[in-house]
UniProtKB/Swiss-Prot annotation:
This is ATP synthase subunit beta. Produces ATP from ADP in the presence of a proton gradient across the membrane. The catalytic sites are hosted primarily by the beta subunits. GO terms for molecular function: ATP binding; ATP hydrolysis activity; proton-transporting ATP synthase activity, rotational mechanism. InterPro entries: AAA+_ATPase, ATP-synt_VA_C, ATP_synth_F1_bsu, ATPase_a/bsu_AS, ATPase_alpha/beta_chains, ATPase_F1/V1/A1_a/bsu_N, ATPase_F1/V1/A1_a/bsu_N_sf, ATPase_F1/V1/A1_a/bsu_nucl-bd.
Length: 488
């Protein structure tokens, strides 16, 4: 639903001041636009340069003036130009027509694929769902990825922080999650690129096309909509593009009643843009120079990401930690909203263990017996204890060798190595690179497999049989094949 226009819609004001991306606009007495209304400035400036800018009202200054933040470059704006009050908030297209397309903060397509064929639009500002509309029973969101489902399960309608440096497999993990939710849950995904590199957005788009997540021949069969506000754009666009992506996701949840994945890369840039806008508006900075409204800004976005009785939005958010300081107000405020953290480790990627999810550093509030059940909880904790013991023994092994360990410790090391290998699995979206067919592993199969390793049932199988397979039956089949090849 498009936002209802207010009584001031169509009122024209005059630009009185331009400071970077911030404009002061004077309106007739009694005709001031509401805060968060979109202003539209179109036409030619005195030099004959075409100007088409949308700005969002942020402050009412007095003397019939408002202060607005532009969503694009203010090059060419001059004092005296007219600004039209649209009478409503910025609205973006929603629904199936957005799938396979790339949008900017204003919902305009930027992929050179022509206009979007839909009349359905929705305002980017709306209240979070009422308490009575929320699904309060915690439900595990099965991803089909063993290491996540067992050790750091995602909550349906929850928020997950994704931590990882360059080249450890963040994008591939994101693609696999998009693929799995489409195939197994019949859901769709929305990707919000907030203040990251344009090159990365382009690479992601090309990789989505290559892996089939975006179907170039028939866009309606695509599984993802993309919304970008990149590093080179003004802070207004970077501050609002996360809300544009979220609005598209909310439509799939509330109207189509689907389970939706919302990716935000990077949530820190959203806070950073808010800080820039806050300074431009003349607000007194808070701790470490952040905006005084930091908690409110983050909360307004995060509280809309939730499970309702109709459907769910599960959010995966890449979190940049400035100077690796977890006490910095930006990541610290974000952490308060997260249900799970998935940490990607370079050391695992170097060993060829993909996905390179760190089984000891990744956490989830869902991993408790009352939510996942006793068997899942016991298996997960037992696996983590074995891996932790292996980590402690590595120094001894490096200095003295395996032979100096006790019988029990040798058994622990053997099982830990099998667990480490079994936590890897081939991905559907990586088939073209690995030549191996992707695997979706049900949670029950994952738990059963790790229980068999921990019980010692599979102690006789070679370590390599556990590498890049799906469930435990594939391990046994691979071990038999290896044995027959060794004989032959």
């Amino acid at each position: 639903m498009a936002a209802a226009a207010t009584a001031t819609a169509g009122t024209k004001g005059v630009i009185r001041q331009v400071i970077g991306p911030v404009l002061d606009v004077e309106f007739p007495a009694g005709k001031l636009p509401k805060i968060l209304n979109a202003l539209r400035i179109e036409g030619k400036n005195p030099s004959g340069q075409d100007v088409a800018i949308t700005a969002e009202v942020q402050q009412l200054l007095g003397d019939h003036r408002v202060r607005a933040v532009s969503m694009s470059s203010t090059d060419g704006l001059v004092r005296g130009m007219e600004a039209l009050d649209t009478g409503a908030a910025i609205s973006v297209p929603v629904g199936e027509a957005t799938l396979g397309r790339i949008f900017n903060v204003l919902g305009e397509p930027v992929d050179e694929q022509g206009p979007v064929t839909t009349d359905a639009t929705a305002p980017i500002h709306r209240p979070s769902p009422k308490l009575t509309e929320l699904e309060t029973k915690p439900t595990v969101f099965e991803t089909g990825i063993k290491v996540i489902d067992l050790l750091a399960p995602y909550r349906q309608g929850g928020k997950v922080g994704l931590f990882g440096g360059a080249g450890v497999g963040k994008t591939v993990l994101i693609q696999e999650l998009i693929n799995n939710i489409a195939k197994e849950h019949g859901g769709v995904s929305v990707f919000g690129g907030v203040g990251e590199r344009t090159r990365e957005g382009n690479d992601l788009y090309e990789e989505f096309k290559e892996s089939g997540v975006i179907n170039s021949d028939d866009l309606s069969k695509s599984k993802v909509a993309l919304c970008f506000g990149q590093m080179n754009e003004p802070p207004g666009a970077r501050m609002r593009v996360g809300l544009s992506a979220l609005t598209m996701a909310e439509h799939f949840r509330d109207v189509n009643k689907q389970d939706v994945l919302l990716f935000i890369d990077n949530i820190f840039r959203f806070v950073q843009a808010g800080s820039e806008v806050s300074a431009l508006l003349g607000r007194m900075p808070s701790a470490v120079g952040y905006q005084p409204t930091l908690g409110t800004d983050v909360g307004a976005l995060q509280e809309r990401i939730t499970s309702t009785l109709e459907g769910s939005i599960t959010s995966i958010q890449a979190v940049y930690v400035p100077a690796d300081d977890l006490t910095d107000p930006a990541p610290a405020t974000t952490f308060a909203h997260l249900d799970a953290t998935t940490v990607l480790a370079r050391a695992l990627a170097a060993k060829g263990i993909y996905p390179a999810v760190d089984p000891l550093d990744s956490t989830s509030t869902m991993l408790q017996p009352s939510v996942v059940g006793d068997e899942h909880y016991r298996t997960a904790r037992s696996v983590q204890a074995t891996l932790q013991r292996y980590k402690e023994l590595q120094d001894i092994i490096a200095i003295l060798g395996l032979d100096e360990l006790s019988e029990d410790d040798r058994r622990t090391v053997d099982r830990a190595r099998k667990i480490e290998k079994f936590l890897s699995q081939p991905f559907f979206v990586a088939e073209i690179f690995t030549g191996m067919s992707g695997k979706y592993v049900k949670l029950e199969e994952t738990i059963a497999g790790f229980n068999m390793i921990m019980s010692g049932e599979l102690d006789h199988l070679p370590e390599q049989a556990f590498y890049l397979v799906g469930n435990i039956d594939e391990v046994k089949a691979k071990a038999e094949k290896m044995a027959s090849e060794a004989k032959g």
